[in-house]
């Protein structure tokens, strides 16, 4: 069995890890970094840039540089959270035919899983470059509070990237695996507080250690899938925009280039204020009016930032209370608090969490890497490389169906350990009813329409009977990824209908296959582009070398020979401007053949120079020899 890699597909940054022997290892990407910005850019030349290269060009290409796509994955366009993002994102979020939130990039409609797949492809290539082998399987993490649609969309992204997603696991659970794997013996109850770039989760996890076999059991989970570092950045950006407007009377919101510069500066300032009390946001030539260029220079203190985001930090505290209550525990029952996600580096976040739990969070867990490490551990468990670890995760939200009167009747309650299966018998609501519609819901509200609709299907062919007579058995089956399978069966006729919830918001099989094919085609195009660049570099180096040799030896080359070499140089230079790899290779070979005499002369000259240097150094050695006269002294004893 090949390696199963662990991927933390984050809102702001992503990370990939593997099991190296019995130890997890976080891998460095092609830029030499252990985390990769979850940023994808589509350039004018048709290139797709991922990570740091995409981030670097964001200022000049804001509308086609996509970030925080995880906030849109598995979501409907009409969702309140999406409507909020439309107002602040520089790129265009549109309504797709099935009601999903999609993105318009250069007049091409793209689904969030298709865009996220580009980040996963980079993670896959990072692992392949390190291992020197093809990678086909992965464990991918998601926020614990992701619903069925968001989990399914994440699996779709994996498939589009050419990965078989062996398991979807919750981010806090993965962090607990990373934390608990090398800890000493003994049972512990931990709280994992995960505040990332776009999502927030809290999980209460019990680690049982019996005869060196560790069981990680999630007791409860809660969270907010639209709360994270991006929201903190937005608050600071808004403040800077308002301050600049007060000073200069210009609203920067109308300038996408200025807003992209401001976004980068705000993120940098926020990070600096985790260690400094004050920082300057200094952006010269941010914009201009009829009076000339304008510069932005605003001082921001840590206390100012804290006042801007305090309500966001407090929004994370309520889920902590709910999770503890659901787990049947009090604050005193928690042995350790683990902080995960880059936003937890903010001192205010750390102090509020410490105040709530009455203890300082642990500092020995890397908040940026723990989730990927845990995913790699789970990959090791699935491949058999890691023994004595059992993971018992939960479903974050209740699952049920709509029943008479528009009520949601739960079949599986939130925080139920998965995989799980539950059946319940329902009956018809009207006389002689020949069909029933099973409307599947996810959420905690009593009124059906207040919950997330996951999909619906019909069970036809029910024998006519008085109301309440027919018996319809509905079964909910959740697999290890938290994906739901539903069946409905007429107990009298044995007629059955099944559905795997693909979510009412989601990609159909045809769309996924098309995106997989597109990704494979792009992969081939990427490979060809890389080869073209390598050949161009070879050509450039050869031109530089031959020109240098010509300058040094032009008096020793016949005029006719010289013209041939210059013509071949011009031909190669011309082809380097084009896209034809085979033509460049042909011209490289042609120049090598024509300039062979020049190369011989140059080599001969180099050899002669070396001989001269050797002779010169020998004579210098001789100069340093001191002549001395020796007198033989005879030993009188002999």
Swiss-Prot record:
Keyword flag Phosphoprotein: yes
Keywords on record: ATP-binding, Chaperone, Nucleotide-binding, Phosphoprotein, Stress response
A GO molecular-function descriptor: ATP-dependent protein folding chaperone
Database matches in PROSITE patterns: HSP70_1, HSP70_2, HSP70_3
Residues covered by region (Disordered): 600-638
Biased composition (Basic and acidic residues): 602-624
Induction of its expression: By stress conditions e.g. heat shock.
CDD domains, sorted: ASKHA_NBD_HSP70_DnaK-like
Protein family according to the UniProt entry: Belongs to the heat shock protein 70 family.
Job of this protein: Acts as a chaperone.
Name of the molecule in the record: Chaperone protein DnaK
């Amino acid at each position: 069995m090949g390696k199963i890699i662990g991927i933390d597909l984050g809102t702001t940054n992503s990370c990939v890890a593997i099991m190296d022997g019995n130890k997890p290892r976080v891998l460095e990407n092609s830029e030499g970094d252990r985390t990769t910005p979850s940023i994808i850019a589509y350039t004018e030349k048709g290139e797709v840039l991922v990570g740091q290269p995409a981030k670097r060009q964001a200022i000049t290409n804001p509308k086609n540089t996509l970030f925080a796509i995880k906030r849109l994955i598995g979501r409907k366009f009409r969702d309140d959270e999406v409507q909020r993002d439309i107002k602040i994102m520089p790129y265009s979020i549109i309504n797709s035919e099935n009601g999903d939130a999609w993105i318009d990039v250069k007049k091409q409609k793209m689904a969030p899983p298709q865009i996220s797949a580009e980040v996963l492809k980079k993670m896959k290539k990072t692992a392949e470059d390190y291992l020197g082998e093809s990678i086909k399987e992965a464990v991918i993490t998601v926020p614990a509070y992701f619903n069925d649609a968001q989990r399914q969309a994440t699996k779709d992204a994996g498939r589009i990237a050419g990965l078989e997603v062996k398991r979807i696991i919750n981010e806090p659970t993965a962090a607990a695996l990373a934390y608990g794997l090398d800890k000493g013996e003994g049972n512990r109850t931990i709280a994992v507080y995960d505040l990332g770039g776009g999502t927030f989760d809290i999980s209460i996890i019990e680690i049982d250690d019996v005869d060196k076999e560790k069981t990680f059991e999630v007791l409860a989970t809660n969270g907010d899938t639209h709360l994270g570092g991006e929201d903190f950045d937005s608050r600071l950006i808004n403040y800077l925009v308002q301050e600049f407007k007060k000073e200069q009377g210009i609203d920067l919101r109308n300038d996408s280039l200025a807003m992209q510069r401001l976004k980068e500066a705000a993120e940098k300032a926020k990070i600096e204020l985790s260690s400094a009390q004050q920082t300057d946001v200094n952006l010269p030539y941010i914009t201009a009016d009829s009076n000339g260029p304008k510069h932005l220079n605003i001082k921001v203190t840590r206390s100012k930032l804290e006042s801007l985001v305090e309500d966001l930090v407090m929004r994370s505290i309520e889920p902590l209370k709910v999770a503890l209550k659901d787990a049947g525990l009090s604050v005193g029952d928690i042995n350790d608090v683990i902080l995960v996600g880059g936003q937890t580096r903010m001192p205010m976040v750390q102090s509020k969490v410490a105040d709530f739990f009455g203890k300082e969070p642990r500092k020995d867990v890397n908040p940026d890497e723990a989730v990927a490490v845990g995913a790699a551990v789970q990959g090791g468990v699935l491949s058999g490389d890691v023994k004595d670890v059992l993971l018992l995760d939960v479903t974050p939200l209740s699952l049920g169906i709509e029943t008479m009167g528009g009520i949601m009747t739960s079949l599986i309650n939130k925080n139920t350990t998965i995989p799980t299966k539950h059946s319940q018998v329902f009956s018809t609501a009207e006389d002689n009813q020949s069909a029933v519609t099973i409307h599947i819901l996810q959420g905690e509200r009593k009124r059906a329409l207040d919950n997330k609709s996951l999909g619906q299907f019909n069970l036809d062919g029910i024998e006519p009977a008085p109301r309440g007579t027919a018996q319809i058995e509905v079964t909910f089956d959740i697999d290890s990824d938290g994906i739901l399978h539903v069946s409905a069966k007429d107990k009298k006729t044995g007629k059955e209908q099944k559905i795997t919830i693909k979510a009412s918001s989601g990609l159909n099989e045809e769309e996924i296959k098309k995106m997989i094919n597109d990704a494979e085609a792009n992969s081939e195009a990427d490979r060809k582009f890389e080869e073209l660049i390598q050949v161009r570099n070879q050509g450039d180096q050869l031109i530089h070398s031959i020109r240098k040799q010509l300058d040094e030896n032009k008096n020793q080359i016949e005029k006719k020979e010289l013209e041939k070499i210059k013509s071949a140089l011009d031909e190669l230079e011309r082809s380097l401007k084009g896209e034809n790899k085979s033509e460049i290779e042909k011209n490289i070979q042609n120049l090598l053949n024509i300039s062979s005499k020049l190369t011989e002369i140059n080599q001969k000259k180099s050899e002669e120079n070396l001989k001269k240097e050797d002779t010169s150094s020998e004579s210098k050695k001789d100069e340093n020899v001191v002549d001395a006269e020796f007198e033989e002294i005879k030993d009188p004893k002999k």
